[in-house]
């Protein structure tokens, strides 16, 4: 924990250097070697080459010994060697085989470990460079990114592919290259003419490898690009679930997501076709080499120009050479996917830096604190080709050591002043001078240490406690968060009226109100205590009493220090304090406040008496006197217990037991489409597996003909016969290889497409409690990576596990049975190795399950660090805490590297053991077979047949180990997908054209139940039409009680509410914080189900509660019809990165909804009419792009990366550029939100604090809009605005979840009740 009672000065300050030196080289290429630092990596590369090269030489020595054994056999039959001498020589040669196998195992193990470690190093450098770019880029760079989260989700996958290519793929490539060179030398030495004949097909192999590799590279690039777009859509819906529900855009997003992943699948099918065709051609050509090699070899034997030893050695070398060439082309095809991944990474890293970042290279750090601040002829324009001036020739001074106020209506440029002063953006023209030095020449660290900006919507770090969220403001001054004296944090918390400092935000951050978050932000500022403080609407979410108290405390604290207030409230401005008035980006007036009182904006404020505060929205307050009732205590809210729970969750995740492959496939069986096609693919894989022992039988016959030739027998007829059979089998193997591989890859991709669609659909149909509950363990980055990246590994369960299993079973059974029939004595010796191989494979698989899961969990931690940095980047820059976040990232990366080294050790041994088993098995089989020959129990034809069958069987069984890492990664992905699907509640909302045909109970413990499917909802009641003609009541609540599900502690927000709202009336809801006002609006929009309750007793007690819209049950109305009936304007409206037009019409043109109006679209004239109504038409027309102007994500002050495709409702891409984006003010966004709601032509309009945080002029516009709508539709608003209360037909006063008063404004104000108490605090 934090250190107690220590002096701040006793702790050393960190170095002022933000960046630590990196061993990563500059990016000069776009291939898998782009992060290799040869000056540092050469020892590792050299050792890796020597080890894998040594293992290749060991393979060559095996080939030589095989040739010697065949030579000894030929001499024995020619009676050139005695029985005793023959047996002794065979023993020596077989012992040599075992010795070479042991050496090769050690070399492969160490070599694989070396290259896997090398791959981990490249991965670390890639992640570090990505992180350095992210944390060093300017805010304008972030604003220009249209798909940052989607891009980085895909880049994370590309980094893993880069690691794999620099690890096991490069190891196999080095081994294969050395093996090819050695085999060429060996084969040419034995018989150059035979070698040339056998190598005749090599040019064709090389040409096929080049052509199909080119296709693979292009298809992989396209798949990566489209997948990143799909990731963006998914992330938007997961981070902004309420937006998707407000505007009935579930089908729009689902359709868009389906189109993208189906397009991605098409590219994968092309990739699979290229890889399968390449593999098939190479397999066919390699097998054909047998025919041409033996034909020519037998010719040489018959003419006595070559010995049997030379022929076998040459032929074995060429055979292995052909397999090596085939293998290297397959490796190069995989390497091409790595090059495509590297191209994606380099494309991101090589993006040009912003102008602001380039200026940092020449900045300086003055030795004194900030004094005078002057803006001189400052212009700031939007980041667009047809730029819009946000500030125009602005010149003013900030009075040093005094209080300064920047006021003006929304969109006048007030917040831009603060962002320019913090160097989040650079001025377009003019200068900002601090003590006569241009701000562009000052080090950003100097700016951040001397100036603190508190924004209206502060960021709360959800992985930290309240204390850590406060302490992070000065973490740069200490070695760590824990080194900060705790009493300093307590003092800051006390200043900001905060308690419960150990409360864990991982569980509770979603329950914080805006006011509570702002108090944490104020505590940070107090702790930092910088010379200059900028407060940008930093009190706007506080209730009046708390706000007034904190303002007084801040002004007392800041006496004698430069303080800048950006505000819409003027009652706390003293007559002699400095005020700057902005209007349309220009200075309208500046001077003492007493000289400004005749300004229009000040007069508007005085005449309306507006108080634009927004009360805190939850009953939990962190003020010192706040206590939970004893009866509501829940042990899960204890901060220390929560820490234990969090660590336990993390530990459980790391040690998650993986499901079996068959268990995963059984659970997900409903999503596996085309089972007949899958069965056909498996059957083809079995045929391919059967072809191997059949070909090995033909191979034994060809060997026999060679021995016949070596002892002088005529074998021309046999050679012709078995050569033709071998050619037929080679072609059959190639055809079945292509068809089985492509079909199974197709089925695997088709499966994950279905899984992605189903998961997206089910997540999109959860109520809001799934996304905001305390037991929601899925972060946005984690679930996006799982669904979009890890499912690529999941398809291995079909594309690799099934053919592997089919091949293993078919080859093993047929090989064993055939060998027993051919010669049971020798066969039984060979068969004894098969159980051992399978046992070791199973044990190795279990070990891999554990290490792969731990490794992937650490990868997720590193990716989560990157995601957190992106989503909180502005706060990180404002408080200059980049070094802290970089340290956290490096520590997690270090942990990942250590797990990666351990994983490399365990993975490497799998490759090594298979070679050892093959060598020992073949040596013992050869020894015992030769013994049977020497005892004349077997003839050489029978011997070769059994040895060949057993050798193929044992070798192929050993290869299973090589496939285990990929299958294990697929197992992990499948386990977590199943876990996600089980976590998704079955309380599905009624969707438009989609429903769930089978659902499960919440928290079902059965692992074998159906996961549901996407299909039509059959209950016609769900499509009930909303009619309003004969109903006088628009809204009716009957005995409604409600508690937010999955939130701690369980407290009823509504208690037996009964409420009737007549048609065409305007109703206001008022009350203190936590009284349940906004909860009513959320229930009306069906964001939560009132039937869901934390315990069954509560559910039974309130089973008769109902909510009706125009006398129809709210929960039986189709969501499309509901969104046509009700529109909502939230307190903090959100917009995606798209055009103004797309944002205004988002969800309107959703014509796929069952029961919805197919003609529900809006015309340009309707848009113009609504924009004029909300007083925005003239402003939007003044923009260079008009309605096609792109809105920045930063417009929302939203750091969650909620981006969306720039496509219209028909899925057509709108041609836009990030250079045409524009940033809107809070007031403009609020007016756009009202316009967006009115364009839906609703019958009921809900407004939640629609005038909070706005200037008097914008507030007046909104009030006039509401007045103009009176009598045309039913309006229900939540407010603390006195002027807005006056225009309501009826006011509903709430307290502690109950309605305590009703009536119009004048009636309630004269009753001296709860309403009077509320209005007194406002007035």
Curated annotation (Swiss-Prot):
ABC transmembrane type-1 domain segment(s): 45-337, 678-969
Compositionally biased spans, kind Basic and acidic residues: 1-10
Record-annotated membrane-spanning stretches: 42-62, 93-113, 169-189, 192-212, 281-301, 315-335, 677-697, 724-744, 801-821, 828-848, 909-929, 941-961, 1120-1140, 1170-1190
Record domain ABC transporter: where: 373-609, 1035-1321
Compartments (UniProt record): Membrane
Family matches, as Pfam families: ABC_membrane, ABC_tran
Residues with attached carbohydrate: 37, 83, 136, 450, 714, 777, 789, 939, 991, 1030, 1039, 1097, 1143, 1149, 1157, 1192
Residue spans of biased composition, Low complexity class: 12-23
Membrane topology: Multi-pass membrane protein
UniProt KW keywords: ATP-binding, Glycoprotein, Membrane, Nucleotide-binding, Repeat, Translocase, Transmembrane, Transmembrane helix, Transport
Main location: membrane
SUPFAM superfamilies, per the entry: ABC transporter transmembrane region, P-loop containing nucleoside triphosphate hydrolases
Family annotation (InterPro entries): AAA+_ATPase, ABC1_TM_dom, ABC1_TM_sf, ABC_transporter-like_ATP-bd, ABC_transporter-like_CS, P-loop_NTPase, Type_1_exporter
Region of interest: Disordered: 1-23, 1194-1217
Biological process, per Gene Ontology: oligopeptide export from mitochondrion
Family: Belongs to the ABC transporter superfamily. Alpha-factor sex pheromone exporter (TC 3.A.1.206) family.
PANTHER family listed in its UniProt record: ATP-BINDING CASSETTE SUB-FAMILY B MEMBER 10, MITOCHONDRIAL (PTHR43394:SF1), ATP-DEPENDENT PERMEASE MDL1, MITOCHONDRIAL (PTHR43394)
Protein name as it appears in the record: Alpha-factor-transporting ATPase
Species: Candida albicans (strain WO-1) (Yeast)
Upper lineage: Eukaryota, Fungi, Dikarya, Ascomycota, Saccharomycotina
Gene from which the chain derives: HST6
């Amino acid at each position: 924990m934090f250190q107690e009672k220590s002096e701040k000065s006793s702790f050393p300050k960190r170095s002022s250097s933000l960046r630590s030196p990196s061993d990563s080289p500059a990016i000069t290429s776009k291939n898998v070697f782009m992060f290799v630092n040869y000056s540092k990596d050469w020892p590792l590369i050299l050792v890796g080459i020597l080890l894998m090269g040594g293992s290749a030489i060991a393979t060559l020595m095996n080939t030589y010994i095989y040739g010697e054994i065949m030579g000894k056999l030929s001499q024995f039959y020619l009676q050139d060697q005695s029985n005793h001498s023959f047996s002794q020589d065979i023993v020596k040669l077989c012992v040599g085989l075992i010795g070479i196998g042991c050496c090769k195992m050690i070399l492969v193990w160490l070599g694989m470990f070396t290259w896997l470690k090398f791959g981990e190093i490249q991965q670390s450098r890639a992640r570090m460079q990505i992180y350095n770019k992210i944390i060093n880029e300017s805010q304008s760079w972030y604003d220009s990114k249209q798909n940052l989260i989607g891009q980085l989700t895909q880049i994370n996958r590309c980094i893993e592919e880069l690691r794999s290519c620099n690890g096991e793929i490069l190891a196999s490539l080095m081994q294969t290259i050395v093996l090819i060179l050695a085999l060429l030398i060996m084969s040419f030495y034995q018989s150059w003419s035979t070698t040339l004949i056998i190598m005749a097909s090599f040019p064709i192999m090389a040409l096929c490898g080049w052509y199909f590799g080119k296709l693979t590279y292009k298809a992989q690039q396209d798949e990566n690009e489209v997948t990143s777009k799909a990731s963006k859509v998914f992330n938007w819906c997961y981070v902004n679930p309420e937006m998707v529900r407000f505007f009935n855009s579930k089908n729009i997003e689902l359709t868009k997501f389906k189109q993208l992943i189906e397009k991605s699948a098409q590219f994968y099918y092309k990739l699979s076709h290229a890889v399968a065709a390449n593999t098939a051609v190479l397999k066919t050509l390699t097998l054909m080499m047998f025919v041409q090699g033996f034909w020519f070899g037998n010719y040489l034997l018959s003419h006595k120009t070559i010995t049997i030893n030379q022929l076998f050695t040459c032929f074995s070398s060429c055979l292995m050479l052909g397999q090596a060439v085939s293998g290297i082309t397959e490796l190069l095809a995989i390497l091409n996917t790595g090059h495509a991944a590297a191209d994606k990474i380099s494309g991101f890293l090589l993006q040009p830096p912003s102008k602001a970042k380039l200026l940092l290279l020449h900045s300086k750090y003055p030795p004194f604190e900030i004094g005078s601040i002057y803006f001189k002829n400052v212009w700031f324009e939007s980041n667009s080709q047809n730029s819009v001036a946000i500030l125009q020739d602005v010149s003013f001074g900030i009075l040093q050591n005094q209080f300064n106020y920047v006021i003006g209506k929304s969109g006048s440029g007030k917040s831009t002043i603060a962002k320019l002063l913090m160097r989040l953006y650079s001025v377009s023209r003019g200068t900002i001078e601090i003590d006569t030095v241009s701000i562009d020449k000052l080090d950003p660290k100097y700016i951040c240490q001397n100036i603190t900006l508190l924004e209206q919507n502060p960021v709360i770090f959800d992985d930290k406690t309240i204390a850590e969220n406060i302490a992070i403001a000065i973490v740069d001054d200490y070695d760590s968060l824990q080194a900060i004296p705790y009493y300093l944090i307590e003092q800051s918390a006390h200043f900001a009226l905060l308690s419960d400092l150990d409360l864990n935000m991982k569980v509770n951050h979603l329950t914080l109100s805006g006011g509570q978050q702002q108090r944490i932000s104020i505590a940070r500022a107090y702790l930092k205590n910088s010379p200059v403080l900028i407060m940008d609407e930093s009190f706007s979410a506080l209730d009046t009493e708390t706000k007034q108290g904190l303002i007084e405390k801040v002004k007392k604290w800041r006496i004698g220090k430069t303080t800048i207030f950006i505000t819409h409230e003027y009652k706390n401005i003293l007559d002699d304090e400095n005020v700057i008035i902005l209007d349309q980006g220009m200075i309208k007036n500046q001077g003492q406040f007493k000289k400004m009182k005749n300004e229009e904006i000040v007069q508007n404020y005085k005449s309306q008496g507006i108080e634009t505060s927004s009360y805190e929205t939850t009953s939990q307050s962190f003020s010192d006197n706040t206590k939970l009732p004893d009866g509501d205590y829940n042990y899960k809210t204890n901060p220390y217990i929560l820490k234990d729970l969090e660590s336990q969750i993390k530990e459980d995740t790391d040690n998650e037991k993986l499901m079996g492959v068959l268990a995963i496939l059984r659970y997900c069986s409903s999503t596996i489409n085309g089972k007949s096609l899958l069965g056909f693919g498996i059957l083809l894989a079995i045929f391919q597996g059967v072809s191997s022992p059949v070909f090995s039988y033909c191979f034994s016959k060809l060997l026999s003909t060679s021995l016949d030739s070596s002892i002088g027998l005529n074998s021309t007829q046999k050679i012709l016969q078995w050569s033709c059979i071998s050619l037929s089998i080679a072609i059959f193997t190639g055809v079945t290889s292509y068809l089985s591989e492509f079909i199974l890859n197709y089925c695997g991709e088709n499966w994950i497409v279905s899984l992605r669609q189903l998961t997206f659909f089910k997540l999109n149909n959860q109520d809001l409690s799934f996304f905001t509950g305390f037991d929601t363990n899925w972060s946005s980055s984690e679930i996006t990576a799982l669904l979009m990246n890890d499912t690529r590994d999941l398809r291995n369960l079909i594309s690799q596990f099934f053919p592997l299993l089919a091949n293993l079973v078919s080859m093993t059974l047929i090989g064993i049975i055939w060998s027993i029939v051919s010669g049971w004595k020798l066969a039984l010796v060979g068969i004894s190795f098969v159980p051992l191989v399978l046992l070791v494979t199973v044990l190795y698989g279990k070990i891999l399950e554990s290490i792969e899961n731990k490794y992937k969990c650490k990868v997720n931690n590193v990716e989560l660090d990157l995601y957190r940095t992106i989503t909180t980047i502005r706060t990180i820059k404002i408080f200059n805490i980049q070094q802290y976040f970089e340290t956290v990232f490096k520590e997690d990366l270090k942990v990942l590297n250590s797990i990666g080294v351990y994983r490399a050790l365990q993975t490497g041994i799998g490759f090594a053991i298979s070679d050892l088993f093959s060598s020992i098995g073949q040596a013992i089989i050869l020894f015992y077979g030769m013994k049977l020959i020497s005892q004349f129990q077997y003839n050489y034809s029978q011997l070769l047949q059994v040895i060949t069958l057993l050798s193929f069987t044992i070798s192929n069984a050993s290869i299973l180990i090589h496939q285990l890492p990929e299958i294990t990664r697929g197992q992990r992905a499948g386990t977590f997908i199943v876990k996600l699907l089980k976590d998704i509640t079955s309380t599905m909302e009624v969707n438009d054209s989609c429903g769930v045909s089978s659902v499960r109970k919440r928290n079902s413990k059965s692992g074998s139940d159906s996961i549901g499917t996407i299909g039509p909802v059959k209950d016609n009641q769900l499509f009930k039409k909303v009619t309003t003609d004969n109903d006088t009541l628009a809204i009716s609540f009957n005995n409604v009680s409600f508690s937010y599900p999955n939130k701690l502690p369980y407290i009823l927000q509504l208690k037996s509410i009964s409420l009737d709202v007549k048609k065409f009336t305007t109703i206001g809801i008022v009350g203190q914080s936590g009284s349940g006002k906004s909860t009513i609006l959320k229930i009306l929009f069906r964001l939560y189900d009132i039937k869901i309750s934390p315990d069954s007793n509560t559910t039974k007690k309130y089973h008769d509660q109902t909510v009706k819209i125009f006398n129809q049950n709210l929960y039986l109305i189709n969501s499309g019809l509901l969104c046509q009936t009700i529109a909502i304007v939230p307190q903090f409206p959100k917009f995606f990165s798209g055009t103004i037009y797309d944002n205004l019409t988002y969800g309107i043109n959703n014509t796929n909804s069952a029961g919805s109006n197919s003609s529900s679209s809006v015309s340009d004239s309707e848009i113009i009419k609504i924009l004029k109504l909300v007083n925005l038409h003239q402003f939007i027309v003044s923009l260079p792009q008009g309605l096609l102007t792109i809105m920045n994500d930063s417009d929302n002050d939203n750091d969650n990366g909620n981006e969306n495709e720039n496509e219209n409702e028909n899925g057509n891409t709108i041609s836009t550029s990030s250079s045409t984006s524009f940033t809107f003010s809070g007031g403009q966004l609020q007016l756009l939100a009202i316009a967006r709601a009115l364009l839906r032509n609703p019958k009921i309009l809900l407004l939640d604090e629609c005038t909070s945080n706005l200037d008097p002029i914008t507030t007046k516009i909104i009030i006039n809009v509401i007045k103009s709508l009176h009598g045309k539709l039913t309006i229900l608003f939540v407010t603390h605005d006195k002027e807005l209360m006056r225009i309501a037909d009826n006011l509903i006063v709430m307290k502690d979840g109950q309605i305590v008063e009703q009536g119009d404004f004048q009636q309630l104000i004269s009753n001296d009740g709860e309403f009077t108490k509320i209005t007194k605090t406002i007035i």
